């Protein structure tokens, strides 16, 4: 079960969920802004918490040094460690496996994860008082699904880099939106795809469960951030983020970080989120129909509370509603999604 808290003000407010404030901007540190995926705001906020709020570490996802095409949960304790781990990681990640480290910490910590991770953390902290006490700030980012590791491996193969010679895999960053880059161990070779090419391929490797997720904008966290894509379309050359403040704690930290010049932000409205992230909104309009298609075949479905999916579904044209339901039925049948499978 996932939960959301939609606003009742305007359709735009309803589409993005509960928000105390909405901003647009970037990290004040030019290196963090350049290295980050979309302006470096999450990294800048995490750094502020380490340097000014005396938080012990940031628990998040980084590349696995032994297998650079895979991810692992890491702790960053300073600017250099955060910088080395900036940028998106479009492969499976499970930062919740490090929550025990936060519980054992001597000071509050920052947690950064996907919307599904932060939703899990929010529910878990209600049952684990020490975890709740040590979570200084929970951050998430806009998410369109997590491709399988095979997606990355196939991209590396397309670039004709032998797996045993891969030194690093970078999905984004080093500019906006950045390129998918594979560096060889000898340090002399780097091959790459554009962001559009790489993400276009990786989307085909997302699991079905991601196609049913209504929480791409990260409703269950203190702060959620993502690309201000409309700025890129308008010729903006450096990264910019949409920043949605969800909680009083997030609001307090963000305002302090702005005052301390860690981030440069300007206020915007809910409509700016829709302009920056139209695909997130469009996807949510189809989810109720996908769930309906599964129920018609008696396939179990996840339960979502507070997202008002039927309200979003009603705004679709009749033809698109039919295509969504029928397309889901075809997927369930031809992909064997109706079969029970063991969890490995």
Task: Locate the predicted segments by residue.
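Generic beta-sheet signal
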Residues: 58, 107-113, 136
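A short alpha->loop->secondary-structure connector
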Residues: 126-140
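Portal/gating segments that form or line small-molecule/metal binding sites
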Residues: 36, 41-50, 54-104
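Gly/Ser/Thr-rich loops at beta-strand to alpha-helix junctions
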Residues: 38-41, 65, 111-121, 145-147
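Short cysteine clusters
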Residues: 1, 116, 210-213
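Short, conserved secondary-structure transition motifs
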Residues: 142-154
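Long, compositionally biased charged/polar accessory segments in the mid-to-C-terminal portions
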Residues: 55-56, 162-344
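N-terminal extension/subdomain marker
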Residues: 1-44, 48-54, 306-340
């Amino acid at each position: 079960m996932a939960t959301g808290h939609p606003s009742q003000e305007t359709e735009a407010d309803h589409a993005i969920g509960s928000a105390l404030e909405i901003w647009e901007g970037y990290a004040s540190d030019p290196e963090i802004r350049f290295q980050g995926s979309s302006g470096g705001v999450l990294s800048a906020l995490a750094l502020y918490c380490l340097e000014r709020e005396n938080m012990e570490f940031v628990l998040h996802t980084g590349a696995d040094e032994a297998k650079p095409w895979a991810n692992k949960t890491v702790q960053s304790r300073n600017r250099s460690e955060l910088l080395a781990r900036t940028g998106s990681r479009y492969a499976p990640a499970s930062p919740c496996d490090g929550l025990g480290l936060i519980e054992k910490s001597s000071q509050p910590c920052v947690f950064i994860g996907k919307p599904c991770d932060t939703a899990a953390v929010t529910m878990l902290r209600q049952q684990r008082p020490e975890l709740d006490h040590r979570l200084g700030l929970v951050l998430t980012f806009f998410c369109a699904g997590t491709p399988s590791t095979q997606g990355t491996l196939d991209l590396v193969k397309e670039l004709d880099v032998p797996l045993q010679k891969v030194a690093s895999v970078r999905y984004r960053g080093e500019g906006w939106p950045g390129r998918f880059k594979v560096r060889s161990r000898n340090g002399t070779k780097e091959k790459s795809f554009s962001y559009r090419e790489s993400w276009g391929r990786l989307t085909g490797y997302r699991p079905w469960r991601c196609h049913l997720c209504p929480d791409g904008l990260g409703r269950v966290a203190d702060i959620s951030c993502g690309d201000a894509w409309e700025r890129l379309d308008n010729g903006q050359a450096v990264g910019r983020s949409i920043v949605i403040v969800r909680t009083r704690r997030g609001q307090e930290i963000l305002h302090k970080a702005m005052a301390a010049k860690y981030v440069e932000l300007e206020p915007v409205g809910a409509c700016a989120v829709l302009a920056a992230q139209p695909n997130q909104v469009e996807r949510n309009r189809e989810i109720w129909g996908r769930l309906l298609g599964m129920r018609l075949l008696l396939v179990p479905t996840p339960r979502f509370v507070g997202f008002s999916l039927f309200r979003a579904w009603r705004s679709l044209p009749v033809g698109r509603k039919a295509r969504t339901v029928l397309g889901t039925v075809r997927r369930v049948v031809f992909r064997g999604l109706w079969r029970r499978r063991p969890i490995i």
